[in-house]
Amino acid sequence: STERLDWTGRGVVIGLSAVHQDTAALTAVMIAATGWLQSLLAAPESDHVPRRVQVLEEIWALLGSERVAKYYQSCQKLARSYGVANISVAHRIADLRAQSDDGTSAAKVSMGILADTQTQILFRQSSDQVSEATEMLGLSTYQAQLLPQLVRGRALWRVGDRTAVVQHRIGSAEWAICDTDQRLNLDR
């Protein structure tokens, strides 16, 4: 695309809800979108813009395509030079495993991305997810025991080799984008 971004604007959202059930369509849209985003991030004029944040929710769905997985891998590796902080969201660690068990190049890239992640924020996981999280993330016995006990809003932060339990506080302005249960609440 020749569409330019206003880097001083509020942000860009690429909504995938219309194609998220169609694997072929999702892959096609993501290949086009990631190519466009990468060219914008690497453009010389992007050197003079404020730092940016790239958030990819339901990262497991995006890592099924080798092209998209490699885009995201390059974004992580070039984050400092692009001035971008990358945030990947997966609601269950098992969702990432589903993308990494088939032995494909995309699966290997996906596991590499996980291994390269320097900051991991883990909210409560059900007991049946803990062994998988422990294996994939290299959790200690203590960290694994904490995961199913975390209360809402509390997370296990792993930054490098340091660990802390952190209470997250969400302001009223942030709640609208953080409340993933809002569609279920009929009172709103």
Named regions from a protein language model:
Residues 185-188:
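Acidic, low-complexity intrinsically disordered tails
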Residues 1-84, 146, 155-161:
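P-loop NTPase motor domains
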Residues 174-178:
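C-terminal alpha-helical "lid" subdomain
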Residues 66, 73-171:
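Conserved ATP-driven motor cores of ASCE-family P-loop NTPases powering translocation/secretion/packaging/pilus
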